[in-house]
């Protein structure tokens, strides 16, 4: 979900790495999370396997009570059109080196033990506090939120995935807030 719809500078992580998946799930980015919608994409071979089987076996379910809601479909089509019109996937790709440089600028901070990134995503891993794993991450989350930045944490790792429309000045602002949060927790 996080690596789809341009986040890595390509339509999906599979495209960036030259992989052709047999099955792929997608959701939030399909409608920019404005309206709930999800999808399952399958290759022709997988689809045919389900559809060409005996009549008494499980089919590839593709319609439920809430399927094909017109509002969600319209939101999905509009979102896909905007991705293309605004060249957002290409924009993300063009920001990647700036993003990486800015994120790796946090490397020398106390308690930062690893930084991982690709595209417009990053994970800043902090050393766990003795006897309280996850507390540094939680405290960083709270400090960032109080300073106006919404981040996600997993244990003691701050996970960042900014919007595709982020500007370089906003990247600087975000990482200044994250750096301050990390510096102000023990």
How would you label these PLM feature ranges?
Residues 1-186:
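Conserved N-terminal phosphate-binding loop of PLP-dependent enzymes in the Aspartate aminotransferase
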